[in-house]
Amino acid sequence: MPNVQSLAIIVTDPRLIISTWKDRCPAPLSSVGGMPILARLVSQLAQAGVQKTIVFALDGIGDVKRILNNRMKRMELVIRIMPTPGSGRLIDLATITEIAEFHGQVLVFTENAVIDPSLIQRLLRSSDRNITVVSRSERRRCLRLLGDIGGRLTAMLPGDSPIRESASADVSPVGIYKFDPALLRAIARIRPHRFNDDLEFFETALGLQRHQIYLMYADPQHVRRVNDATDLEAANFASSSSGDQFSILERLQAGNWRYPASEHILLCNHHFPPASVVDRLRERLQDLLYLQPSDQLDIIAKLSEMTDLPARNLAVGNGVGELIKALYGYLDPRIVIPTPTSAQYIDAVEPNKVSRFELPPENFDLDVEAFANFAKRRQASVAVLVNPNNPTGRLVPVQEIEWLASQLAIEKCRLVVDETFIEFSVAGKGNSVEKLLSVFPKMVILKSLGAIMGLGGAQIGYLASKDEQLTHGVRRRLPLGNINGIAEYLLWILPEFREEWEASFRRTRADVVSFSRMLDTIPELEVHPSQANYLFCRTPEAWPSAKHVATMLAKRYGVLVQNCENQCMKYGDRYLRLTVLPYEENRYLVSALRRINEELVEWSTQSKRAGTAYHLGC
């Protein structure tokens, strides 16, 4: 190949099938953005200036030829059957005859993946002769790689390595490489007899001191493996326009796991769990899925140990939402509730049985005396208090709740307190009213554990009250086996991670302070002090609405935030609720909001000068 300076080798396996309820298709031939994945990669290579591409198919060469017609664009294309198909594709590539006399750049692709074109350009432009593209991922892989400060590969770790918490150990190859053909030829000479294992390939390569291999990090959104139907849906979502992505996500109430999107909406603990918790779950996964979980009474016994409350005073639910419905079903209440608030406490009861107590917009603090009088006037049987408030993050002190409970008790009105986010407050559990349950036996506490464990999919919450008749009545309205095995197992292993759990709350509190200071740099954005893991912000007057800004963030910057236009409050369309994430994600959002603010201030100025509405797009 005297005139070829760049060569690409693609190893594809049409035997890998993606199945849906309506169709079955070889993974490389599955369509993303209207084009088969394999054809998409070949087209990208041609556009990047690669002069020759060799596609090695492990099977189904006819289908591969069919979909690659007219994809060359002045690039030579060769389709071959893989000579020795096995589990170690890199070892096989080292022996192929096509590179016997080749001296240019060799790009290698061994995974069925949707790749951002910029990554191919980075590989071609790099002066490094040998590169392995890596990414950080929560998925366990068969091989993990370690590099030195200069980015050179120094060691490998098999997937079953005991090292878990090292950030370096979590870097894995994504199936994209650039090799000096001399390295491939050298490995072929050293390993004429092989076990077809990629670990063996890198072990051999590390022994060749003349051929250093460098690690190139790729953002996860730049390499999307497609091995099943959910991967395919995620890849199609990622390849769609920002407007289409926003339309999909705006309709979702849950199920975000299917779509790759950055978001400041999910109210979970982002510093927990550590990877070792997930590893423990993985080790037990087969039993947790195959065998039935325990019934309520067994799980309540474990909750009793965790909360230090008697089992007879507890009920456990598949999330707080299930407990709210069971509680309301038992009480048939007329409720009063401060607003804005969590919608699930309002939606679970008939509209004519809800009275909303509006919180003052200057600070959204609850006046407990005014609220007690409001409950009395409305002859409420239940007063609901979410503390810290969702979405405002404001906290009612324990002493004030104690006074409120005493006044409501006189009127035979129960106080229901949701303490889901109490651990994120400055005093943590010190702000809980669990200590008041003995004083006010009619009081009820509700709490979601999934949120503070950082595992929204765990779906477990509990109800606590000294009113045993109530807890028994709530239990009778719940399925006997309403908690999944994964959530149950978490209750068993969490004691091993108490220190990490407590540390996660401290880290979140620090993030709240840091994020609030960053947001304060945006002119006229009013950030309310928060005792939760989210911030409630009133938008500047120059912004058309919170929803408009949320749309701009989603479409232009790929970030989802919660606009509060549907909250039960005045001027809800002026407010955003922003979940506090680790520093880099917070910084990215603030940077995007600054740029949006500059544009909207300019838009507002132009509108005033023109004396009419100046066109503004999302």
From Swiss-Prot:
CDD domains: AAT_like
GO MF annotation terms: pyridoxal phosphate binding
Keywords annotated in UniProt: Plasmid
Keyword S-adenosyl-L-methionine set for record: no
Domain of life assignment: Bacteria
Gene3D superfamilies documented for this protein: Aspartate Aminotransferase, domain 1 (3.90.1150.10), Spore Coat Polysaccharide Biosynthesis Protein SpsA, Chain A (3.90.550.10), Type I PLP-dependent aspartate aminotransferase-like (Major domain) (3.40.640.10)
InterPro entries linked to this entry: Aminotransferase_I/II_large, Nucleotide-diphossugar_trans, PyrdxlP-dep_Trfase, PyrdxlP-dep_Trfase_major, PyrdxlP-dep_Trfase_small
One annotated GO biological process: biosynthetic process
PANTHER family the UniProt entry points to: HISTIDINOL-PHOSPHATE AMINOTRANSFERASE-RELATED
Family (UniProt): To Rhizobium NGR234A y4qD.
Protein's name according to its UniProt entry: Uncharacterized protein y4rO
Organism: Sinorhizobium fredii (strain NBRC 101917 / NGR234)
